[in-house]
Amino acid sequence: MNRRHVLGLAGAGLLAPHVVRAQGFPDRPIRLIVPWPPGGSTDTIARLFQPRLAEVLGRPIVIDNRGGASGATGAIEAARAPSDGSTWMFVYDTQATNETVMRLPFRTMEAFVPVSLAASGPLVMVAHQSTPFTNFQQVVDAARRAPDTLNFATSGVGGLAHVSTTLLQQQGNFRIVHVPYRGGGPAVQDAVAGHVPLFMTNVVIVSQHIRNGVLRPLGVTTRAETRHV
């Protein structure tokens, strides 16, 4: 292969083994870079796919978490790896947006070969149980009364959660303060602890906390309700 392989977050790529076998494949473990810390949605889903990928590819899969800079740190590491098929990356939406918000030493579509879409799901805005909010309109009303006083967490700058919440603010004429984290894992920890009142994220990492009543769903980015919240 002349480019690194990317497995996108949003069924494991059954075409991948045929592609790599046709071009020769290293007889050693595959390094699967997850450009986020452990505990977030990308890491969680990558670990769900890990056994199946190892079975299909016929090689051990070693997950390497390289969090930082909204996924850019891990992506740079992956781009610098030998283009021999031994390094793959499991990505999230920021791989599509990072080039627009920061300077990278590569062009994403030139440095990587997309393999497969792995999972998809809606974003959800949640509030800690200690807040008075039970729906998103209440957040809008509070933010209009006192702009820039409510904080909301995301997994990092430039991700879909950040971009979509910024768009909501522009369209809804209200302002809340973005608190970017170094991944969904650290962000959900602070959201559950009540250190940040609002958290915009995907459903995967908060569904259990919603069921337990620690986090309260205020709205989802779908036209219809989702069974996960």
Give a label for each model feature.
Residues R66-G74, G121, V179-Q189, N202-I205:
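Short helix-initiation/N-cap motifs at beta->coil->alpha
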Residues L32-I45, A69, T154-L160:
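Extracytoplasmic "Venus flytrap"
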